[in-house]
Amino acid sequence: MSESTAYTIILHGNDATGKSTLVPALRAAGEVIYARGDDDATLEDTIVVRSFDKFTLRLADDDRGPLPQSYTDKDGVQRRIVRIILDADLDVLQARLAKRPSTDQWESEKSLFYFRARFLGHQELAAYHGLPVINTGEKSLDETMAEIIALARNPETLALFSKLALRTLTPEDVASLADRRAVIAGVDYAKRLEDIIAAECGETSLFTPEDVRAQCLEDPGLVHALVNHHDNLHDAEAPLRLRQIVEGESKQIYKVESPLTHHFDNLVLVFLKPTIYSHSKQATAEISGLSAVRASGSRLFLEMLHRAGISHTYHGLSAHGLIWARSTEITQIETVYKELCAGTDKHSFFGMAADPNVTLPTGQYKRGPYVRFDWRNPNHVYNGVNPATHPFYHLMEASVGKNAFYDKYLTGRAKPLGDKCVPEELVHSVQAVEASVDWTTRIFFTIQHYLHQIGLEVQDGCVMLDPTGRIMWSEINQDCMRIKRRERTETTNGSHQGVFDKDVWRAGGSSVKEAILDKWTQLNGLLREHLAGRPFHENEMVAAFEPYGMHATEVLADKTLTLTPRYRALYERLATHDRSLLRSGGSADKAASERLLALMQEHIWQAIAAVPPLNGHDEAKRMVRLANTFARRVGLPPAEVSALSDADAETILGRTATPPGSKAIGVTANKYADKTDEFALAELGIKLLRPTGRCLRITYELVDQAKYTKAFGAGVTVHFVPTRPKDMPGLLAQGMLDGAVTYSSVMDNFPTVARLVASTPDADISLALIRRRGQAIDPHGWSADRPARIVAEHGRMVRAHLAGLGVSPTTYEIQHVLGSSESYLVNDPRETYLLCDAVIATGGTIQENDLDVWQVVKNKGELLVGLYQRV
């Protein structure tokens, strides 16, 4: 290798991303390579390997200098440094760590999430320094090695990463790479503009043809911008282009287009425009320097979210207001958090702020914080359309000037609209409601936790989430929340001294541009000082609770609040959430593995109860995922998992309980034993002789040979085994029993492992769905996002009955129990469960516990006692 092409590979990344596997493999392939733990200490100052990780222990800022690009080795050869960050999804990292003999606090779930966010999950260091990222969880070892080597041998592609590094990228660079006013050879711009005007400036256009022509006379370069943007014209030979795909009131969004790499295919570059807007005041402005302040604030709020394990699409931000973000699916929903009756609530709900039934004297809601949903409407409409979607809109705005454009076109022609509150029932079809409430609460409880520590509070705020409700994609800073001092003094009341949000500008408008810059900068300084003085690895990483959980505990303890059952249950769950648990005592995370086993058992019950029984596709998928995860956690190699075949199951299914000519029959030992004995005598020709005392052996007298032979066959001997009814199906499936005398309410709610040979109806008992006495039950009000919860022993029968009523199985959940299901309704002050099932004989239990029958699932005489023989 010549000096001009010599290079050294340096791998960085979170624990378990594959560094220790890749380094020896690449060295064996002839590469010069280093990674943390496998580096040359004498070269540390020259190439920066181990010390690179220290960047994850400090807050993100723009004071970090450049990394070395090359060095001279001991042989005097000048070598390029090829620096690559390795990544893998969190579950992959955890599965790999599960195979290690021990782990420490640096490898807990919360640590892996945080440092992945700082390294590359949100790619802060990768985005800042312009480093390529390779996901080792998606490729084999050979594929990963090939990708690393290909990158190392392609300086042109690596230069593209460097060019797009947030450390050096400026808004001017973005404008140059977008080159919206470029003159493309061979285009007749004047003629093409007239064609576009004719097509786009019709009845629903905010602009008349004369508006566009007049502005182009004042600004000739606008002609090129309008045509280029409309027709997506650009230099097709350019190795790198930024194509603007979206522009809004506060942001421009670009896609990277380059023939050199697909690395940026799932990323977007966001530019925060130096703008501010208030719908309530119908005012807008540009404030020089605001982009940098918003970006710095976003960095600090993202730091809080990273510490709490909350995902955001932002990878990294710069002081220029530039952001690398992951592309994601979005919805029209804005999720709003409210603690006080202020802002929109105060102005929309007349008198609510002073109503003692709704609010406290502090302005807080008596029922505590709540989350609502808004439909994101255009700020203005013109002739029934959103004028901002016009292909000329933002280019005309930039050319005319923001304030002049607003006055002439929006105030003068369009009508204000703005976002509107939307009922949850309408949100379900576009965004997961309960997950959105959960995650929005986590976001603002986390922020509240940190703000309280410096004497501030967030009173309300808004975020935007993906359809799952679990990934945030919107801006997060002072611009999207209301932040005040907790203790307002006489000197701050009536002034802006205790206000750190957009209310400063709402109150003063353009006259307070400098004031809002000053207040937002002050807030950034307070947050930075506090977070820098409490680094994650010394505080949250070793804490037993999450930031949002600690604030949830405070809210639960607030005696002035009367929380609703829905939110109390949410806060109780958040208060006990702990992501700091460590793996220990073996090669697997025992606690997680045990939980996986319990989940698999529960999903088996759900699959058993599927309607019809064989239509359990969704549950089958869930069980496969859980089983594969469990296999990884206990160290079973993937090759062994895939090698398992039907033959392994057939071996068990073919097992016989007893030798030919003999049968083992299970019979109940206690409840309904008298009914079992009566059936055996009447239908099987057998008188069961049950023991007394502690003896367990059951014998019998043969009373009717013909009935016995019909039931069991000629020449067959039978012995009886006292068995719990709910154990019978499993014992039959495993071949431990050949048959069982039991009820259809048992056998018909398990997988079909036996056939009914003989039976007698029981006219004394029925099966019913039970409710709290007099409670209204409307299955049509159940939904997938807010499903009804039902406690049931007889899941299959319950599902079949509800299906007969036309109730979708996606709108309710069955919690399987093995007995005393009524107790879950009786001892449930939060009313978590709506219904339970029960076998009813006299009805005494439901009467004494203030319950009644909602629906009869099986009438008296429809439940059978019978002999079931293994199939």
Swiss-Prot record:
Domain of life: Eukaryota
GO biological process, one term: purine nucleotide biosynthetic process
Gene3D superfamilies, A to Z: ATP-grasp fold, B domain, Phosphorylase Kinase, domain 1
Keyword entries, A-Z: ATP-binding, Kinase, Ligase, Nucleotide-binding, Purine biosynthesis, Transferase
One function term, GO molecular function aspect: kinase activity
Pathway: Secondary metabolite biosynthesis
The enzyme's E.C. designation: 2.7.1.-, 2.4.2.-
Note, other: Cordycepin and pentostatin biosynthesis coupling is an important point of metabolic regulation where pentostatin safeguards cordycepin from deamination by inhibiting adenosine deaminase (ADA) activity. ADA is not inhibited until cordycepin reaches self-toxic levels, at which point ADA derepression occurs allowing for detoxification of cordycepin to 3'-deoxyinosine.
Role, per record: Nucleoside/nucleotide kinase; part of the gene cluster that mediates the biosynthesis of cordycepin (COR) and pentostatin (PTN), two adenosine analogs with related bioactivity profiles as both mimic adenosine and can inhibit some of the processes that are adenosine dependent. Within the pathway, cns3 catalyzes both the first step of cordycepin biosynthesis by phosphorylating adenosine into 3'-AMP via its kinase activity and the conversion of adenosine into pentostatin via its ATP phosphoribosyltransferase activity.
Protein name per UniProt: Bifunctional cordycepin biosynthesis cluster protein 3
Species in which this protein is naturally found: Cordyceps militaris (strain CM01) (Caterpillar fungus)
Gene (name only): cns3
